[in-house]
């Protein structure tokens, strides 16, 4: 080997050693016994995109080993060695997936989308392997068949029944051929759900209305106009432009107050037709979802997907669910008709020369309210600033339930807009961590919801894990 080749080989070895050392030095927070933070809140600033997939793969491997230990256990299946053991399995996977799921919906990015696309089929396949495992299901069924003769508590019996039902609904009773078909359908659905949500978020962020004539802003509150001006600046537009988006704080005031009817129509149609055409058209995706769901229902012995979904809830069948909806729908339609009649009368009185259309509803509802009750919602708005509302809710919680919410300004948070609270019981002991994240942004899906970033449990050995809840 000549000197150049020897030098090149040495460089390659050195580079490889350096990379290996760097990988070894890199600590994956998800794979540590504890995060080392207050109440074990995820250390968001220390979590890298590169941490998720290795942690998920290791979590899946750990869960598979834990499930295999249940399967090979020669002891007679009982609640502890089967049902409880399954519930305790996969805690590493749950740990990382809860954080990933939370951030994917509240602080999305192209990197998170790429990770989601890679892990979704892996998670789907791994779950199916467990739920359709005949040896594991045999143990579950053994406990289920003897549940009333084992001295179990009512809660334990319910747990056994729910577990058995979950396995059956996941395909545990199917033939090998149908199991294989169901696995394919589940993989397809996981991809379709990803595509649907990706299109929805992309279409929401792509839509905007640019106004460059201040006359078109007539009727809008100053706060709404200022917000639109800020949005225009963020979009790189010069002064004298205003940008309105589909995010609720931008969309709703426009529909409610804008005197420009064409502006209201444009916003309304943009919202109701979201992701219905163009680059982010969800029409074909929805069509594929409907067909895949129908196939899944048929494999599991149901006439349609609605029957599959309602069979395990209080309604029990689609007819009962529809009947409940109609009990609300019919009087609601009647009331809306009465409201629209009032709106039309007011429009006629003002000489508007229009027939009330859907994009007029919020606007004329506000006009009727002012006309009938002299109530200006924009004047009331000042009393309902987010900090005031949050403080009021916390005060009510303390008076009703004795719990206190104490802000933790130094606690880890996944976005600067997030506030973190220590939830204390009446005796001052720690109950939970509560995070609030109430403002819209391009990286967050629309809507309002809550979820757990960390679940709660009490193990038989007395180990307690308190929940970390986020409210969006």
Language-model features, listed with the residues they occupy:
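Short charge-dense sequence patches
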Residues: 33-39, 67-77, 110-116, 129-143, ...
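Active-site-proximal, well-structured secondary-structure segments within enzyme catalytic domains
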Residues: 159, 188-191, 198, 202-245, ...
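Gram-negative bacterial Sec-dependent N-terminal signal peptides
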Residues: 2-22
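Short His/Asp/Glu-rich catalytic/ion-coordination signatures at enzyme active sites or charged loops
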Residues: 36-51, 100-119, 141-184, 245-284, ...
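Generic detector of short, well-ordered, non-transmembrane alpha-helical segments enriched
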Residues: 16-18, 48, 393
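N-terminal helix-rich structural modules
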Residues: 23-222, 227
């Amino acid at each position: 080997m000549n000197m150049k080749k020897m030098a090149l080989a040495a460089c390659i070895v050195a580079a490889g050693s350096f990379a290996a050392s760097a990988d070894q030095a890199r600590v994956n927070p998800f794979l540590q016994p504890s995060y080392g933070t207050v109440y074990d809140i995820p250390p968001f600033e220390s979590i890298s995109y590169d941490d998720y997939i290795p942690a998920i793969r290791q979590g899946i491997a750990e869960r598979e080993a834990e499930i295999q230990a249940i399967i090979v256990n020669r002891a007679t299946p009982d609640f502890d060695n089967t049902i409880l053991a399954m519930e305790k399995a996969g805690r590493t996977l749950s740990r990382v997936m809860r954080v990933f799921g939370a951030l994917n919906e509240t602080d999305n990015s192209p990197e998170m989308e790429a990770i989601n696309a890679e892990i979704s089929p892996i998670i789907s396949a791994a779950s199916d392997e467990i739920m359709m495992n005949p040896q594991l299901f045999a143990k579950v069924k053994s406990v289920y068949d003897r549940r009333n003769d084992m001295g179990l508590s009512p809660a334990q019996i319910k747990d056994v029944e729910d577990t058995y039902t979950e396995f059956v609904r996941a395909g545990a009773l199917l033939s090998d051929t149908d199991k294989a078909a169901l696995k394919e359908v589940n993989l397809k659905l996981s991809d379709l759900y990803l595509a649907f949500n990706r299109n929805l978020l992309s279409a929401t962020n792509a839509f905007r209305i640019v106004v460059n004539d201040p006359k078109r802003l007539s009727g809008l509150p100053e706060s709404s106009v200022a917000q639109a001006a800020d949005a225009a600046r963020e979009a790189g537009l010069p002064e004298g432009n205003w940008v309105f988006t589909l995010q609720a704080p931008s969309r709703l005031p426009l529909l409610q107050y804008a005197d420009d009817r064409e502006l209201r129509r444009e916003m309304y149609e943009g919202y109701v037709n979201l992701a219905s055409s163009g680059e982010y058209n969800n029409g074909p995706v929805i069509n594929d979802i409907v067909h895949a769901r129908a196939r899944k229902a048929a494999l599991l012995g149901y006439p349609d997907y609605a029957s599959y979904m309602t069979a395990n809830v209080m309604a029990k069948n689609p007819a009962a669910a529809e009947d409940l909806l109609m009990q609300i729908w019919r009087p609601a339609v009647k009331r809306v008709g009465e409201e629209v009649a009032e709106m039309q009368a007011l429009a006629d009185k003002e000489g508007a020369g229009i027939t009330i259309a859907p994009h007029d509803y919020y606007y004329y509802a506000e006009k009727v309210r002012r006309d009938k009750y002299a109530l200006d919602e924009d004047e009331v708005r000042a009393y309902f600033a987010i900090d005031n509302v949050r403080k009021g809710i916390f005060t009510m919680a303390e008076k009703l339930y004795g719990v206190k919410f104490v802000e933790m300004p130094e606690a880890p948070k996944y976005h600067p807009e997030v506030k973190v609270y220590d939830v204390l019981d009446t005796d001052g002991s720690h109950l939970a961590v509560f995070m609030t994240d109430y403002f819209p942004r391009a990286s967050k899906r629309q809507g309002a919801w809550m979820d757990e970033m960390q679940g709660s449990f009490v193990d038989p050995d007395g180990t307690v894990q308190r929940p970390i809840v986020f409210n969006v």
